[in-house]
Amino acid sequence: MAMDSQPFRGHIPNGVPPNRTYQEVYAENGRWYGTFKKGKYMFPIDESSWSRAEMRVIVLPSTTRKLLVYWTWVAGQVSGASTWPIIGPRVYAEIYRHLKPYYGYFEQVEIDWSPRSDDGSLRRDGYVVQWANELMDAMDSFGRPIRLDSNLTKQRLADVGFDEIKEEVIQLPLNGWPTEVHNRELGRWFNLGVRQAFQPLSLAPLCRGHGRTPAQVDELAEKARGEVYSNSVRAYCTFPSFAEPAGYAQVTPKSTIPAPFQRAWVGSREPQSGTCSVQRENGANGDRSTLSATGTFHVIRRIRAAQTPAAVGKRQDAG
């Protein structure tokens, strides 16, 4: 059965992270899940999932930690990553309330799990697209959407008082086919994480919401793995140039709010078809690296919103 879950009552089982006790986990379809608000977080927390999360050092939002919220309250800044539609707009209001006036800003990072390819090498009726669509549909049915809606996010930020909201879309290779060394390595690492995530991400949602059996989910995940493993899946992109002159793409062009996080600028305002380069400067030490945006992509969307003097004035008037 898809919902044969029972809390574990014996010794701590194999595969459970060492910092977990048996009261904190329950078994369902061969994986271990957390009992806190049981059923809300539908992804496993067993050892294999946390092993995959260790790949976060390559600066790709990991699938296990993607739905968790991390806060850093430092110098009036808030840094967080999560699936915000699950949490609701009240969190935006709390973030806004705690930001330092005239200085604080908020940055949100998401992965768009809709795979895409412009040259048709990724079949729209293929297994990867089927997996992504079924997963997003299932999560929608539970009221826990992972489908991105940039316009809704911007509107919610504006509703609580943020202005100068800027969205940056970074395209990410799904596998290691690119010829450029750095981009190929990036694609290989992301490919490793994605292939390990197909089954755990979709097991509970598809079994609970779509009536799939564990065997059917395993079969779909295996076919999706085979599809993304092939470097014959190729595509291209044209990375949009910014409205500002060549150089840094200012996060808040009409204010004096500093931007200590990473900044990006377009290496060429008219990139050649099929490839373009984005240089990134680390705000801590000034090191630069180049990421070529080519290939079959998942899309990371980063939205930055600032508290400007105008926004603070609106907040004071409302108070």
UniProtKB/Swiss-Prot annotation:
<keyword id="KW-0489">Methyltransferase</keyword>
<keyword id="KW-0804">Transcription</keyword>
<feature type="region of interest" description="Disordered">
    <location>
        <begin position="269"/>
        <end position="293"/>
    </location>
</feature>
<protein>
    <recommendedName>
        <fullName>Protein-methionine methyltransferase laeA</fullName>
        <ecNumber>2.1.1.-</ecNumber>
    </recommendedName>
</protein>
<keyword id="KW-0805">Transcription regulation</keyword>
<dbReference type="InterPro" id="IPR029063">
    <property type="entry name" value="SAM-dependent_MTases_sf"/>
</dbReference>
<dbReference type="GO" id="GO:0008168">
    <property type="term" value="F:methyltransferase activity"/>
</dbReference>
<keyword id="KW-0843">Virulence</keyword>
<dbReference type="GO" id="GO:0005634">
    <property type="term" value="C:nucleus"/>
</dbReference>
<feature type="compositionally biased region" description="Polar residues">
    <location>
        <begin position="270"/>
        <end position="293"/>
    </location>
</feature>
<comment type="similarity">
    <text>Belongs to the methyltransferase superfamily. LaeA methyltransferase family.</text>
</comment>
<comment type="subunit">
    <text>Component of the heterotrimeric velvet complex composed of laeA, veA and velB; VeA acting as a bridging protein between laeA and velB.</text>
</comment>
<keyword id="KW-0749">Sporulation</keyword>
<dbReference type="GO" id="GO:0032259">
    <property type="term" value="P:methylation"/>
</dbReference>
<keyword id="KW-0808">Transferase</keyword>
<keyword id="KW-0949">S-adenosyl-L-methionine</keyword>
<comment type="function">
    <text>Methyltransferase; component of the velvet transcription factor complex that acts as a global regulator for secondary metabolite gene expression. Controls the expression of the chaetoglobosin A biosynthesis cluster via the cheR transcription factor and the subsequent production of chaetoglobosin A. Positively regulates the expression of smtA and negatively regulates the expression of velB. LaeA also regulates pigmentation and spores production.</text>
</comment>
<dbReference type="GO" id="GO:0030435">
    <property type="term" value="P:sporulation resulting in formation of a cellular spore"/>
</dbReference>
<keyword id="KW-0539">Nucleus</keyword>
